[in-house]
């Protein structure tokens, strides 16, 4: 239909090569709604008659329930929809639908509408997952576990503290995506192919109809720039990387060697040959799919970095990367929420491992600091105690007075003071005395949980307001269309 300048049609193999009709299934609805807003604006600006608008809008409305044939011969969904409108409304009316519009502003409109909906879905899923983390944390405020650095036991901690850490990380993912929405929710419609149009359209009118906050003003920028796509996929890549980190922890902790947690059967797979196996395949796939999302980002950046200003057909290729990114992240968040809420925590094993380790070493050093001894001296003493415990194959709490005396050699510290401090410290007392803001201390858990629940509520309120604004605009658009048809 678009080949008026060219004499011959594309061969079947060439058409298959250039066609994006399969990828365009994800934006069909947005293309129809965007076209309806454009036609309504053309009528309001007296560019087309009410009779023409009625025929076009009725045809577009009927297409919302249509099942499209990917073997139609159209290069993309835009051509297919216009061809169907012309077939139903006639060329004299349907042929006016594309007035003052190009596929260049049309496709980027569809992509922006699709991504903004995906962001709202992901943000809702994020809040559900964050809420699940906080909910599980609330039930494990006294569940003792070792905390790790370099995958080596570092300090005694609480499982709630671990879960809240990831709740905070995902909250930042929410905030990043929430902010990205503001830059995506700008309408490119009316920018034309690249330099605008001589026809008296109203770009702000269509932007308002479709729930956009504003327009992408510069027509070159509006049609050719895909920085908003790169930003969106980048934000989701960070989100998936954060989920992958949780997945890695849970894969390790669900092993027989750790036995800290057990995943529900619905999130594991058996071996094809070893009947005793319970493999964390879902978590492993999360790591793998994170790589896929990062690959999508790389594909997008690699595509756009080589383009001159103005639209290039290369940009057609990034759509599948966008859809894949959205699908993977939404599925991952839905799975993680359910997985967290069905997680079995082996509290006894966590505590046993914590108490059998020398995780009170830093507490000993800090107690000595409170006696006025320089930290570097106390660090040396605690390190010596740990080494002696390791060599004698017993915990620090079981060291003899003779051992302790060796640990303070070359210092002026009284070994009796060290013995007294060791005798007073347990894992539980350590956590009770942990007072720093945001620490693993018992008191901090209650405060942080309360604070996070409030933040989740505030986030939901803001998100609902944003969704309602878009829905209200689209409902108003539908009413205006219904008045005409």
UniProtKB/Swiss-Prot annotation:
<comment type="similarity">
    <text>Belongs to the lyase 1 family. Argininosuccinate lyase subfamily.</text>
</comment>
<keyword id="KW-0055">Arginine biosynthesis</keyword>
<dbReference type="InterPro" id="IPR008948">
    <property type="entry name" value="L-Aspartase-like"/>
</dbReference>
<protein>
    <recommendedName>
        <fullName>Argininosuccinate lyase</fullName>
        <ecNumber>4.3.2.1</ecNumber>
    </recommendedName>
</protein>
<keyword id="KW-0456">Lyase</keyword>
<dbReference type="Pfam" id="PF14698">
    <property type="entry name" value="ASL_C2"/>
</dbReference>
<comment type="pathway">
    <text>Amino-acid biosynthesis; L-arginine biosynthesis; L-arginine from L-ornithine and carbamoyl phosphate: step 3/3.</text>
</comment>
<dbReference type="InterPro" id="IPR024083">
    <property type="entry name" value="Fumarase/histidase_N"/>
</dbReference>
<dbReference type="GO" id="GO:0042450">
    <property type="term" value="P:arginine biosynthetic process via ornithine"/>
</dbReference>
<dbReference type="InterPro" id="IPR029419">
    <property type="entry name" value="Arg_succ_lyase_C"/>
</dbReference>
<dbReference type="InterPro" id="IPR022761">
    <property type="entry name" value="Fumarate_lyase_N"/>
</dbReference>
<dbReference type="Pfam" id="PF00206">
    <property type="entry name" value="Lyase_1"/>
</dbReference>
<dbReference type="GO" id="GO:0005829">
    <property type="term" value="C:cytosol"/>
</dbReference>
<dbReference type="GO" id="GO:0004056">
    <property type="term" value="F:argininosuccinate lyase activity"/>
</dbReference>
<dbReference type="InterPro" id="IPR009049">
    <property type="entry name" value="Argininosuccinate_lyase"/>
</dbReference>
<keyword id="KW-0963">Cytoplasm</keyword>
<dbReference type="InterPro" id="IPR000362">
    <property type="entry name" value="Fumarate_lyase_fam"/>
</dbReference>
<keyword id="KW-0028">Amino-acid biosynthesis</keyword>
<dbReference type="GO" id="GO:0006526">
    <property type="term" value="P:L-arginine biosynthetic process"/>
</dbReference>
